[in-house]
Swiss-Prot record:
This is Urease subunit gamma. It comes from Yersinia rohdei. HAMAP family: Urease_gamma (MF_00739). One of its GO terms (biological process) is urea catabolic process. One of its GO terms (molecular function) is nickel cation binding.
Amino acid sequence: MQLTPREVEKLMIYTLSDVAFKRKARGLKLNYPEAVSIITVTALEGARDGKSLEDVMKEASKVLTKDDVMEGVADLIPNVQVEAIFTDGSRLVTVHDPIK
């Protein structure tokens, strides 16, 4: 299978988010990469589902709380940016203050 660097990166993000969602379900606090992967995948999947850019940003900013992450992780993530494919094309999604 031939994958582009972007496809490899997306695959890694989705793999990490799968692990992160399972850890979150077990009640474990998430570290930085796990938190970013969950926020990113939430945005990517929202776009894929046909949601608007505004709805995707809102949903991705509500997927995690400070109680879900290790101490200090929320402060390390002022925003998350990902290029997502919407029904009308590709757009940059910026989620500001994603962990509240």
